[in-house]
Each structure stands twice: as C-alpha cells, then as structure tokens.
Amino acid sequence: MTKTLTKAAEIKVSYHPKNSTNPVIRNSDEAYYHLLRFFPENTISLNERFVVGYLNRMNKLIGVYEVSKGGITGTVVDVRLVLSVALKVAATSVLLAHNHPSGNLQPSEADKELTKKIKEACKLFDISVLDHMILASEGKYYSFTEEGLL
C-alpha cells in the first residue's frame, strides 16, 4: 500500500529584499497616498475592499495585499490571510485600510472589532498594527491612530 500526499493550496509571495526604492511611511497622510492607489477610482464608491500594507522595521512599504473585495455594504476579512502574508514577507508592522462605498468615514462597530481582532493576532507574532484607515477619494480618510483608537 502506498501513501500519497495531497498538495495543499498555498499563498505565493514574491519577495525581493532590494527595497531601497520602497517608500517609507512616516504618517497617515503618506499611508493614505500609497494605499489609495489600490482602491480603483471608478469603484471606490461601488464596493468595499480591504487591503493591508506590509512594512519592514524601517517602516518601508514592502508590499500591499488585497485581503478581500465585497459588496456595497461590506466585505469579509479573514485574519489568517492578513497574518499569513505578514509572516511570508517578514513584516514587522502592518497598515490596514478599507473603504466605505457610502462615503461615511466613521468606523462601524464591526470595523472596531475587526481592528481589535487583527491587533491581538499580530501581537502574538510581534507585528505592530500602525493604523487602520477608512479611505475615500478626494484626500479624505479616517485614521484609527489619529483618533486614538489604536
């Protein structure tokens, strides 16, 4: 009797350590500028997306991953995906960002709970959550850090 192993699905990440040209994120304005491009202008008011920016110990943005894309009123975020990519790219911190298609920048209770859940999970691996931002077009955003919620 021979045993066969079943291949498991895996997340593939291209890792290129030469990141001298990667931007350094020093504040919420810079985070907004670099993360907004992952929210297409023609759909930012149509469907909700959740993306994570991954940073190294020098706060250089080493990558961005779209965790989920949902509908008009929400999206589902799997914390395991957030962490699995962070571990694969050896991130020391993360920036969380999502949009509200309604244009309302105030965080919902679900947004606050998700932030807490991700922060607690990241803490187990010594990964910092630098901010969770709710983005809109035209230079508008809500920062959990600036509002004292992180």
Question: Which sequence ranges carry the predicted segments?
Answer:
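Active-site-proximal loop/helix of nucleotide/amide-processing enzymes and allied scaffolds
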Residues: M1-P17, N56-M58, T73-L150
